UniProtKB/Swiss-Prot annotation:
Belongs to the universal ribosomal protein uL24 family. InterPro entries: KOW, Rib_uL2_dom2, Ribosomal_uL24, Ribosomal_uL24_CS, Ribosomal_uL24_KOW, Translation_prot_SH3-like_sf. This is Large ribosomal subunit protein uL24. The keyword rRNA-binding applies. Part of the 50S ribosomal subunit. The keyword rRNA-binding applies. It comes from Citrobacter koseri (strain ATCC BAA-895 / CDC 4225-83 / SGSC4696). One of its GO terms (biological process) is translation. GO terms for cellular component: cytosol; ribonucleoprotein complex; ribosome. SUPFAM superfamilies: Translation proteins SH3-like domain.
Length: 104
C-alpha cells in the first residue's frame, strides 16, 4: 500500500497540544507514526557519555505522533487536505482531493 504521508511533506496537526501547527515530516515510522520538525517536543533526560565526549542534561527532541493526528497541508488552498492516488503516464502519483493538483 502506498503511503499518503511521506518524508519532506508539509503537514498540519489536527489534534493534541500542537493543534494547528505546521511542520515538515522528518521521518515516517513503520508503526503508523511520524516525526515532524518542531512538533510534539519532549524533554529527554540524557546521561553523559564521556567516551563520545557528550555532556549529560535535559535535551528537547521531537517525539513521534500518530499519522491519524496529522493531515497534509495544501499550500494552494492554505488548509489541510486529503490525499488520493491516480496514474499519470504509467506512474502512480499522489494528488490533493480538494483541487486535484499533483503533489510534488
Amino acid at each position: 500500500m502506498a503511503a499518503k504521508i511521506r518524508r519532506d511533506d508539509e503537514v498540519i496537526v489536527l489534534t493534541g497540544k500542537d493543534k494547528g501547527k505546521r511542520g515538515k515530516v522528518k521521518n515516517v515510522l513503520s508503526s503508523g507514526k511520524v516525526i515532524v520538525e518542531g512538533i510534539n517536543l519532549v524533554k529527554k533526560h540524557q546521561k553523559p557519555v564521556p567516551a563520545l565526549n557528550q555532556p549529560g542534561g535535559i535535551v528537547e527532541k521531537e517525539a513521534a505522533i500518530q499519522v491519524s493526528n496529522i493531515a497534509i497541508f495544501n499550500a494552494a488552498t492554505g488548509k489541510a487536505d486529503r490525499v488520493g492516488f491516480r496514474f499519470e503516464d504509467g506512474k502512480k502519483v499522489r494528488f490533493f482531493k480538494s483541487n486535484s493538483e499533483t503533489i510534488k
